[in-house]
Amino acid sequence: GTKIWTSSAHIADYMIAIFRTSPPTKENRRHGLTQFLVKMKQPGIQVNPIGQITGQYEFNEVVFTDFFVPDDHVLGEIDGAWKQATSELAYERSGPERFLETYYVLTELVRAVGKNPDTRSAEGIGRLVAQVHTMRRMSVSVAGMLQAGKEPVVEASIVKDIGTVWEQQLPHRVRDLAAFVEETATNRETLEKQLSFAIKTAPKLTIQGGTTEVLRGIIARGLGLR
């Protein structure tokens, strides 16, 4: 089989993967999935790096052909990986990296406008910072639920959806505000370079960790809408 969009597989010694180990049932089509720890450096595994518009290679396609995984590399319950995976995703989807991946362009903008920004810049930056604080509180709230032993699948999906859409839009908002930055700003060149990089990398943000469409389906089910 083939797995697409595997982060850092080209430099990894091991990866975690879910494979079908028995047929699904009529009652549960997700039954029969098992999670394994897979050794990457072995025959039957081919990693194809995927180039990005930024020139980086971060994601990969992994092709499996007649490779072997020993029994002691099973993670968790045999045939019960779906529940494990959805629980694990609550950790992945609610963390601060889901709204801070392009945050550096905002900090560079703050440096560029200096201590006495014009009214438009001050209002724009203030609005963005308020949104960051709101998302941080949401992320911390989900962390508290996880610490209490709960499974905030819907709540984590909301954080990821709101956060990645926001950080995808952030470089464009900063670009609009950067138009008012003085040409003499000491970090003007740095800001422009970081903006260029952030705009190129932003499209991936609503795909990695679960696409926006998948997340909204999870949220809809949690609310009883589907």
Task: Locate the predicted segments by residue.
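A short core secondary-structure module
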Residues: 2-46
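Short, well-ordered loop/turn and helix-capping segments at boundaries between secondary-structure elements
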Residues: 20-24, 39, 43, 65, ...
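C-terminal helix-coil-helix/basic helical segment that borders enzyme active sites and/or dimer interfaces
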Residues: 119-122, 133-190
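Glycine-rich phosphate/cofactor-binding loops in nucleotide/flavin-utilizing enzymes
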Residues: 84-91, 95-99, 178-226
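Tryptophan-centric aromatic hotspots in well-structured domains and transmembrane helices
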Residues: 5, 14-16, 35, 59-63, ...
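Glycine-rich phosphate/pyrophosphate-binding beta-alpha loops
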Residues: 4-9, 53-54, 204-209
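Glycine-rich beta->alpha junctions and the first turn(s) of the following alpha-helix
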Residues: 45-137, 205
